[in-house]
Amino acid sequence: MARFIFITGGVVSSLGKGLASAALGALLQARGFSVRLRKLDPYLNVDPGTMSPFEHGEVFVTDDGAETDLDLGHYERFTGVPASKTDSISSGRIYTNVLEKERRGDYLGKTIQVIPHVTNEIKDFINIGEDDVDFMLCEIGGTVGDIEGLPFFEAIRQFSQDKARGQCIFMHLTLLPFIKASGELKTKPTQHSVKELRSIGLAPDILVCRSEGPIPEKEREKLALFCNVRPDSVIAAQDLSSIYTAPLAYHREGLDQAVLDAFGITPAPKPNLSIWEDVADRINNPEGVVKVAIVGKYTQLEDAYKSIAEALTHGGMANRVKVEIEWVDAETFEREDPAPHLQGFHAILVPGGFGERGTEGKIKAAEFARTRKVPYLGICLGMQMAVIEAARNLAQLDDAGSEEFDHEAGKKRFTPVVYHLKEWVQGNHKVERKVGDDKGGTMRLGAYDAVLTEGSRVAEAYGTTAIEERHRHRYEVDTKYRDALEEKGLIFSGMSPDGALPEIVEVKDHPWFIGVQFHPELKSKPFEPHPLFRDFVRAAKENSRLV
């Protein structure tokens, strides 16, 4: 039976609850325990799948096709435990479930209320799989005091009462601001945050305090006194140069020991942190630097491409180099020469995205990489842009484009080498879609198999010809142009098992030019870099010696 750790936040948002949860999960694993991490988001969207990247950051897709919060990416990267649909939920999904049950008559005519019906739905979600792991870590999104979060805070209060004494603990993450004028860390915001938490029936067992530096003993004792926690349960979460040193930093602060003490687990198994020591060594001691341009649409918000940035870091670790990322707005050279914007980079990556804005710039970036022999990785839309570029400039199909852009404009302007995907095979059944369907949850989502061409660069990278990768797209490259493109050197080196859907293209006689329809960044980890990112950074490293 699992022990439950509820992670809440106060004072301000974006303090790093997700990272703290992920790091704690990794530390518990290092002591031999099994863990599962969950995110409960109070927003009213059913899931983040239709939210703007500027609003929410990236959407993290699981093997079973759930569109989830980017924090689940941190959970997977730090613990290696694949997330699923049962690891992410929102108020929107909770209320949808409750209302569907009411329509079916499941509540037998009762008046539907937040308590008990909504809170029971939340508790039922938390309980899923409780017998499968030693520890269940549940992060509540937002901050204490948010109106949207009240049903979740009430639900976890009830949940802790429903369970046996000592089966649940609460970890509260707050901010300790440093006032330069007085040279002091201020504890008052944390005291008020804990006061707010206690007013709704929750008392923290552990305080994790985000700060620029260490917490002096005087302030630690003050927090312990006024927030009613043990001094050794006041944990400093200091600013770090890399998130991947967080497990070691939290261990030095005693977070994992404080958790085990709160549960009364003695003697505590000793941790094996060798994996994280190796990760920290690779991060802190690079043997070179490579510069990678990410040519995208949402470059003003780096969280929109969070997993890509992390996967590049993992590729750098594998090659003992630091990857310096430059965010390049694809719109800046839609109507001008891309060379001044892209010269000097050792590799170019074009990520996924939606809509026509910026696509001509991405096509130019693909052309620049192909003609200048610069390593190129195109992901999802980035692969489609590479195919359109090759169709226009190699296969003489001057008006090559995507149906997506025609649908957006409301008129036909392009020969669609990329078309709206209307059917595909998922497991043992066929999925059908049409233009005009609801946006939410209707893409080709989750893990799908692909078959690679023997002797291809991608088969060499993976070390096999059978792979499984995660997808999130509704447009696909049309195979009827395959022969014409392969004749000109754009090889279709990966296909769906039925041969209907192109999964990977690569350019013949190029140092490293690969486009993939899937999202390899979603499966990369610091201790297990994805083979495509490993080899992409290796190619950038080789190119750095030539530039």
UniProtKB/Swiss-Prot annotation:
Residues where L-glutamine binds: G353, L381, G382, M383, Q384, E404, R474
Key words of the record: ATP-binding, Glutamine amidotransferase, Ligase, Magnesium, Metal-binding, Nucleotide-binding, Pyrimidine biosynthesis
Full protein name: CTP synthase
Any one Gene Ontology BP term: 'de novo' CTP biosynthetic process
Organism whose genome encodes this protein: Jannaschia sp. (strain CCS1)
Pathway per the UniProt entry: Pyrimidine metabolism; CTP biosynthesis via de novo pathway; CTP from UDP: step 2/2
Enzyme Commission designation: 6.3.4.2
This protein's encoding gene: pyrG
GO MF annotation, one: identical protein binding
Free-text function comment from the UniProt entry: Catalyzes the ATP-dependent amination of UTP to CTP with either L-glutamine or ammonia as the source of nitrogen. Regulates intracellular CTP levels through interactions with the four ribonucleotide triphosphates.
Binding site for ATP: S14, L15, G16, K17, G18, L19, D71
Further remarks about this protein from its record: CTPSs have evolved a hybrid strategy for distinguishing between UTP and CTP. The overlapping regions of the product feedback inhibitory and substrate sites recognize a common feature in both compounds, the triphosphate moiety. To differentiate isosteric substrate and product pyrimidine rings, an additional pocket far from the expected kinase/ligase catalytic site, specifically recognizes the cytosine and ribose portions of the product inhibitor.
Description of how the protein assembles with itself and partners: Homotetramer.
Binding site for UTP: S13, K186, T187, K188, P189, T190, Q191, K222
Binding site for Mg(2+): D71, E139
